[in-house]
Amino acid sequence: MKFEVLKTDGNARAGVLTTAHSVIQTPIFMPVGTVGAVKSLDATDMREILDAKIILANTYHMYLRPGSRVVAEFGGLHGFCKFNRSFLTDSGGFQAFSLRANTKNDEGGIKFKSHIDGSIHYFTPRSVLDTQYELDSDIMMILDDLVELPRDPHALGADEKARLKKRIDLSVTRTIKWAREAIDYHKFKQSQGAGLDQNIFGIIQGGTDYDARKICAQALCEMPFDGLAIGGLSVGEANEHMYETVEAVMPFIDAARPRYLMGVGTPEDIVENVQRGVDMFDCVMPTRNARNGTLFTSFGKIAIKNARFVNDHEPIDPECECYTCRRYSRGYLNHLFRAHELTFFRLASLHNLHYYLNLMKQIREAITAGKFSEFKREFYAKRSGGEI
């Protein structure tokens, strides 16, 4: 993998990330294909209509079903899903966190109960890489120890703050330990001829504790990861705490490597964190919101189910050139949604993902032109009316 920063504008960066399967302009948004498909779309949609260069697949879900060995028999994710561009696979740590009622973390890894059949499994720093070697993704994420955050940590009582601090410190200690195990194992596997075209990213934990983030970032930057991710945000904390944490940790992340903010987020979150130096994003929001009838536009969000769109002949966004907006009206989409027609999911998902990918293109162009601040002002000015 090769990463090069081509242009900076303040802390915002425009660059290019090259894997064995695609050349990716950054900052980039990665659509989420949890079980090997972006919901309601196929590889042709992703490649030919949206021109997506990289998508995310989930190690936890692919491990449980159909199993990474099955995927390997098809030639990895690229052969199985027929998407011949890049894949990033997360480690499954977030899914274990989200299912924490059935999960137990210890010094060796994460023990969890399958949401499918109740069977018991144990993820370790090595086992999640073994799964990802079989998936043959371009970018693999290490196992990390995630902490649930309160919306406002400053509002906690003294005892609650002490408990949270203790848990965050444990998370950082474990994450650093697991990172060392992962990078050593990856070097060993590559020396044996495995994963030669696969890259490995470390994940920085530490909650909203700046000192903990600094410790974790500095430790992981000393390891030869191909990229570094900021994990453990957008898990309950208010947006301002997310932005402050990203801003605080950035000086301690190697500028020569791509920076990935995991699970984020809204268009506003993306703009704010690009300004702080983030290169890569992923989130289920564009497709999840699409299925629920919330569509993104340059001017805000549309709840397409609303009655005022029944006779609306306009496209979702008059400024949008996506597949859906060039063909269909708000009135038609309103009808499809109300009729529970499955076609709606595809058309709405194509639109929302186009919106996100086009937003990234506009951001890259603004950074390259040295006009990111102007772009940000216009972005917020157009959206000041809120939901349409």
Curated annotation (Swiss-Prot):
Its EC number is 2.4.2.29. It catalyses: 7-aminomethyl-7-carbaguanine + guanosine(34) in tRNA = 7-aminomethyl-7-carbaguanosine(34) in tRNA + guanine. The active site is at residues 90, 282. Keywords: Glycosyltransferase, Metal-binding, Queuosine biosynthesis, Transferase, tRNA processing, Zinc. GO terms for cellular component: cytosol. Zn(2+) binds at residues 320, 322, 325, 351. Belongs to the queuine tRNA-ribosyltransferase family. Catalyzes the base-exchange of a guanine (G) residue with the queuine precursor 7-aminomethyl-7-deazaguanine (PreQ1) at position 34 (anticodon wobble position) in tRNAs with GU(N) anticodons (tRNA-Asp, -Asn, -His and -Tyr). Catalysis occurs through a double-displacement mechanism. The nucleophile active site attacks the C1' of nucleotide 34 to detach the guanine base from the RNA, forming a covalent enzyme-RNA intermediate. The proton acceptor active site deprotonates the incoming PreQ1, allowing a nucleophilic attack on the C1' of the ribose to form the product. Homodimer. Within each dimer, one monomer is responsible for RNA recognition and catalysis, while the other monomer binds to the replacement base PreQ1. This is Queuine tRNA-ribosyltransferase. The gene is tgt.
